[in-house]
């Protein structure tokens, strides 16, 4: 019996994440690579499929999935373009505003197309976010340290922001630290989301790492996740590709497709 493969376009295939995703798709039995989208491409074909420099050239193209691993400044327009043209977006690019996410969810419902924007595709990172949401009920004083490679363009990371947003659902907003604390250097205490501080580290040699540090009287709790290389994201990407074919609206966060 012939297997009906899910047809995938990869946008951002020249990046490290995109290149890893292309190999995963090529090696997967139930996926079929259909086209690649890059920036100022000088080739017309790679891996046996056509290569495009303009997303508009993909209008009417035969594909199910638009896998977007591009840049924050392009992600919103790319995701909306995908929905407009009948592709189900699976997006690993971060940097979306709350209004942009809300708009895309609304638009996906109008188009009756499934999709996914995932701040992090690593299953361990998704579990870290969920564990943090549970822990903050008992440890409301918390700070986040996220560490990434020095090529990452946005700060704080989408994972850190999503973690803080999830914890804010269970935590009353309040200031942490001395009431009269003063920063000797501007920004020393990090970004502030409802009183939770988020600190961003950018260094060569890192991939993607996050610590959520809780403090209480006489004790502390630290939750940490590490992605040592980009293969850690491929299980989540593959899961997302499969799952968006079964739903009719865009979801924000891989946790919507996990049994948590």
UniProtKB/Swiss-Prot annotation:
Pfam families: DapB_C, DapB_N. It is found in: Cytoplasm. It comes from the Bacteria. The active site is at 148 (proton donor/acceptor), 152 (proton donor). Its EC number is 1.17.1.8. GO terms for molecular function: 4-hydroxy-tetrahydrodipicolinate reductase; NAD binding; NADP binding; oxidoreductase activity, acting on CH or CH2 groups, NAD or NADP as acceptor. NAD(+) binds at residues 12-17, 92-94, 118-121. (S)-2,3,4,5-tetrahydrodipicolinate binds at residues 149, 158-159. SUPFAM superfamilies: Glyceraldehyde-3-phosphate dehydrogenase-like, C-terminal domain, NAD(P)-binding Rossmann-fold domains. NADP(+) binds at residue 40. Its main location: cytoplasm. GO terms for biological process: diaminopimelate biosynthetic process; lysine biosynthetic process via diaminopimelate. It is an enzyme of class 1 (oxidoreductase). It catalyses: (S)-2,3,4,5-tetrahydrodipicolinate + NAD(+) + H2O = (2S,4S)-4-hydroxy-2,3,4,5-tetrahydrodipicolinate + NADH + H(+); (S)-2,3,4,5-tetrahydrodipicolinate + NADP(+) + H2O = (2S,4S)-4-hydroxy-2,3,4,5-tetrahydrodipicolinate + NADPH + H(+). GO terms for cellular component: cytosol. Pathway: Amino-acid biosynthesis; L-lysine biosynthesis via DAP pathway; (S)-tetrahydrodipicolinate from L-aspartate: step 4/4. Keywords: Amino-acid biosynthesis, Cytoplasm, Diaminopimelate biosynthesis, Lysine biosynthesis, NAD, NADP, Oxidoreductase. Catalyzes the conversion of 4-hydroxy-tetrahydrodipicolinate (HTPA) to tetrahydrodipicolinate. Belongs to the DapB family. This is 4-hydroxy-tetrahydrodipicolinate reductase. It comes from Lactococcus lactis subsp. lactis (strain IL1403).
